[in-house]
Swiss-Prot record:
Protein name (record): Lysine-specific demethylase JMJ29
Positions annotated to bind Zn(2+) 3: C338, C341, C363, H381
Positions of short motif Nuclear localization signal: 755-762
Gene3D superfamilies registered for this protein in UniProt: Cupin (2.60.120.650)
ZnF start-end (RING-type): 209-256
Secretion signal span: none
Regions of compositional bias (Polar residues) in chain numbering: 161-172, 184-204
Chain intervals annotated as zinc finger (B box-type): 333-392
Family: Belongs to the JARID1 histone demethylase family.
Main subcellular localisation: nucleus
Taxonomic source organism: Arabidopsis thaliana (Mouse-ear cress)
PROSITE patterns on file: JMJC, ZF_RING_2
Region (Disordered): 30-62, 161-204, 713-743
């Protein structure tokens, strides 16, 4: 790890989004040897003579006269050539005269100084000029390469090149490659200056590159589609490596709608995000389908609230119809959570009139039943034994702050006071309340709002008698063009996952096909999702440049550092942004050649993604398959889009994940997303990859370190049972392929394992049994789990997956995600991911009516976790979404 990298424990980390961008100095155009010029003149034109401050004015005049004679000579050589450089020489001469005047002024100022001051000034000037000469020589060579390429293009293409863009504008010296059209090149340039919105803000005469807004390039390619937009060769090579010069001339990136210049990247509305408009009959059918699935949950919630009203009627000695419920303070600008279980409050709840302690109806029910848990805080103390220990060597003395064992706070003796009539006293002080006043029933929504909603839903369903659309599909047990084998279970028929092409998802029968698999809780893989988009670059450096050049971003000036996660220590590291992205494409290693795996999670923050990268956001949404479900803005079957105005919507993305990766499974410090379970549905698109190849020296070092890791694991487990057998098994595993499916590792980029919902109990049992075989923070063994899945402290390696199948007879769906593929993950399905290459993924969450029951089940599961558990907060508010 670099010495400049800071390591911090990752508990509830927040990424730093403070941006900076190095301003690149404009390069100065240099004369070059064109066709027909002599080598001597070319050599003379490159020489730069340092001006001396002590030169007399007469010598300066002679030097300028000599320079003018050389200009005439150069113009003779270039008279019939495409590249007219006389104007450049004039401008460059003017610059040198200005610089000469500045030097004279400086000399006048320091005449009164001593010799040391003058000597120091001459030393600085000489050093700067020496560096500048080297830069000029390098730039000359680069420009000559471009000229050679232009000559080849001119010789092999039918396009014509203009000798002069305007007879009245001697400053236009840039070559423009344009198609043979009836329009003159001058009119093309005029249009590019007057009509191009992206460059109109830049007031510069003559042709300029649309990308870099510079007019000093030797060769510009003009688009034959719009006949006005131009790109220089350097920008094409740097920012559009997938486009050739011919492609740009045929149709420029701006016309292709994938221009990644600073201006275009911050424009929104250029990409049509919705793939098709729904007919009225389709909308009616979708709404009926949605309400049919949601109405049972609405009825259940309504019954639950009516029971609480009956308890309140008993407390007040009235009939339920006579109970008046006071409206709580408006909560439209904030989320309301239960102060005991942290679950979101939808409508009815109890509140203390003195301390405003709020309690949800579920906690009220548990208090009356005597089953309420205090949910004490959990305390994790992972031991930091140093970097040597993480790499399988001897451990250092653990720091005093990390030598405690995992422990759980002792439950307090405080108890809730429950009246005989069902009334509840405020929570004791130890639990956050005042313990004095009775909790009163409060409401958030209008009094009859829920009953009216229930009545409207039932009326709607009875008024439209639409026959259900069904598609009897058996592809889960058959290998076809629309399926991908992902498991080898002998007792079930769901080993094949539905895997359609993105071009076919717009068909109605494909949506029905998707719904049938989705209702069963099966993942779905959509191939080539990015093929339907304009092709905007998802290269991380392009995204970083867009963030840094965002003038509206308050943090764009502090982007030089990012906080990534070190996968080996599971801790935050602060690293230079450019170094991180260089490691993304080239790889990074520790001093012992063990691969260093870093990842950026939710970068930039999802709540700012649409503002900071509007074009990327629109492109991602336009690429989403089955937009009836996945569209975070207008998906008709996405329940998360149904919240009325004024309510705070849950943060469902889009979210970007950028992480390193290599094909080999390291077993320790892999670039992984550990086993977890999302409380909502999600779709994940792989937008960019970069392959990193390990050297032979690295491979040898990794193999030796793996042996040390095995020995360390045996010591940590303090067990030598069956050591010989296990050692043989592990030795075989090192030589076995990681991917057991028929996927080609060269095309695959991310290895997914998704478990079925019905296998979760056995999976949890296995994890509890083998939890100490996993490593988490500081690469320390996991000593205790509160919830084996929601703790997110385990990743099942190939060895663990084999043991899981041998002991419990279950296995996940295992497949490799390729570039451009979209993976749909149903709510309630535990899953994990390991990167086989450096990957950039973009994901968005949604809530489908088929899986709302799983969202509510997970909400109940999360509320049973300890108070400070990171998964405990009800971020989705599934109960509110069900309304």
């Amino acid at each position: 790890m670099d010495s400049g990298v800071k390591l911090e424990h990752m508990n509830c980390f927040q990424l730093s989004y403070q941006y900076s961008w190095t301003t690149r100095k404009k390069r100065t155009l240099k004369p070059f040897m064109s066709k027909g010029s002599s080598p001597s003149s070319s050599s003379d034109s490159r020489k730069r003579k340092l001006s001396r401050a002590e030169d007399s004015d007469d010598s300066a005049v002679k030097r300028n006269a000599k320079r003018r004679r050389k200009i005439c000579k150069v113009e003779e050589y270039y008279e019939d050539d495409d590249c007219i450089l006389s104007d450049w020489v004039q401008r460059n001469t003017a610059k040198r005269i200005d610089k000469r005047n500045e030097e004279v002024e400086v000399m006048v100022k320091i005449e009164s100084g001593d010799d040391c001051t003058i000597g120091k000034w001459f030393s600085d000037v000489s050093s700067k000029r020496k560096d500048k000469r080297q830069v000029e020589v390098d730039e000359d060579e680069e420009w000559e390469e471009e000229v050679t390429l232009c000559s080849k293009i001119k010789a092999t293409s039918s396009r014509s090149r203009t000798h002069s863009l305007s007879a009245n504008s001697p400053e236009n010296v840039t070559d423009v490659i344009s198609p043979c059209r009836s329009r003159s090149p001058a009119s093309n340039v005029s249009d590019s200056i007057q009509k191009n919105d992206c460059t109109s803000s830049r007031k510069q005469s003559g042709p300029i590159c649309h990308q870099c807004l510079k007019g000093e390039r030797i060769t510009l390619l003009i688009c034959s589609e719009c006949e006005k937009t131009m790109f220089c060769l350097q920008c094409i090579r740097k920012w559009y490596p997938n486009l050739s010069e011919d492609d740009v001339v045929e149709k420029c990136p701006l016309c292709r709608q994938n221009c990644n210049c600073s201006k275009c990247l911050h424009l929104n509305g250029l990409i049509e995000t919705s793939k098709r408009e729904l007919a009225k009959s389709e909308r009616r059918h979708h709404l009926q389908y949605l309400i049919t699935l949601m109405l049972p949950f609405l009825n259940k919630l309504s019954i639950f609230q009516k029971l609480e009203i009956e308890f309140e009627a008993t407390v007040q000695g009235k009939l339920p119809s006579e109970v008046e419920i006071t409206a709580a303070i408006s909560y439209t600008d904030e989320r309301v959570y239960c102060d005991h279980c942290a679950t979101s409050i939808v409508d009815l709840h109890r509140s203390c009139p003195k301390c405003s302690y709020e309690l949800c109806l579920k906690c009220c029910q548990e208090i009356r039943e005597g089953s309420l848990s205090e949910r004490p805080e959990m305390k994790f103390h992972y031991v930091d034994r140093g970097h040597r220990y993480m790499h399988g060597l001897d451990a250092a003395e653990p720091s005093l702050s990390s030598t405690f064992e995992d422990e759980e706070a002792n439950p307090s003796d405080a108890k809730w006071s429950l009246g005989e009539n069902g009334s509840i006293t405020c929570a004791p002080e130890k639990l956050g309340g005042c313990g004095e006043r009775m909790l009163e029933l409060r409401r958030i929504l209008p009094l009859t709002w829920m009953s009216d909603l229930e009545h409207k839903a039932e009326t709607f369903l009875s008024s439209y008698n639409i026959s259900p659309r069904m598609l009897n599909c058996r592809c889960s047990s058959l290998e076809t063009e629309l399926t991908r084998k992902s498991a080898s279970r002998t007792t079930s028929s769901d080993n094949y996952l539905f895997c359609p092409e993105s071009l076919g998802v717009l068909k109605e029968e494909e949506l029905l096909h998707f719904q049938e698999h989705w209702a069963k809780g099966e993942p779905v893989i959509v191939r080539n999702a990015l093929d339907n988009t304009p092709g905007l670059s998802w290269e991380p450096m392009v995204m970083w440049r867009a963030l840094c050049e965002n003038v509206n971003s308050t943090s764009s000036s502090e982007m030089s550092q990012v906080k990534a996660i070190d996968c080996l220590a599971n801790c935050e590291v602060e690293i230079n942004t450019r170094q991180f992205f260089e490691g993304y494409s080239k790889g990074r290693t520790y001093e012992n050649f063990w691969p260093e795996m870093l990842k950026l999670k939710d970068w930039p923050p999802s709540d700012k993604f649409e503002d900071l990268l509007p074009r990327h956001c629109d492109e991602f949404i336009s690429a989403l398959p089955f937009q009836e479900y996945s569209d975070p803005r207008t998906g008709i079957l996405n329940i998360a889009t149904k919240l009325p105005e004024g309510f705070i919507k849950p943060d469902l993305g889009p979210k970007t994940y950028i992480a390193y990766g290599i094909p080999d499974e390291l077993g320790r410090g892999d670039s992984v997303t550990k086993l977890h379970c999302d409380m909502s549905d999600a779709v994940n698109i792989l937008t960019h990859t970069a392959e990193v190849t390990l050297s032979q020296e690295q491979i040898s070092s990794v193999k030796a370190l793996k042996q040390k890791h095995k020995l360390q694991n045996k010591v940590d487990k303090q067990s030598t049972e069956d050591c010989n057998e296990k050692e043989e098994e592990e030795e075989e595993e090192l030589n076995m392929p990681e991917i057991s499916s028929n996927e080609n590792e060269e095309t695959g980029s991310a290895l997914w394992d998704i478990f079925r919902r019905e296998d979760v109990p056995k999976l949890e049992e296995y994890l509890r049994k083998h939890c100490k075989e996993f490593r988490h923070t500081y690469c320390s063994p996991v000593t205790k789990v509160y919830h084996p899945i929601h703790d997110q402290s385990c990743y099942l390696t190939l060895e663990h997956k084999r043991k899981l199948k041998a002991e419990y007879g279950i296995e996940p769906w295992t497949f490799v995600q390729k570039l451009g593929e979209a993976v749909f993950i149903p709510a309630g399905c535990p899953h994990q991911v390991r990167n086989l290459k450096s990957c950039t993924k973009v994901a968005v969450d949604f809530v489908s009516p088929e899986n709302i029951h799983e969202c509510l089940r997970l909400t109940e599961e999360f509320r049973q976790l300890p108070k400070n558990h990171k998964a405990r907060e009800d971020k989705l508010e599934a109960s509110l979404l069900s309304l």
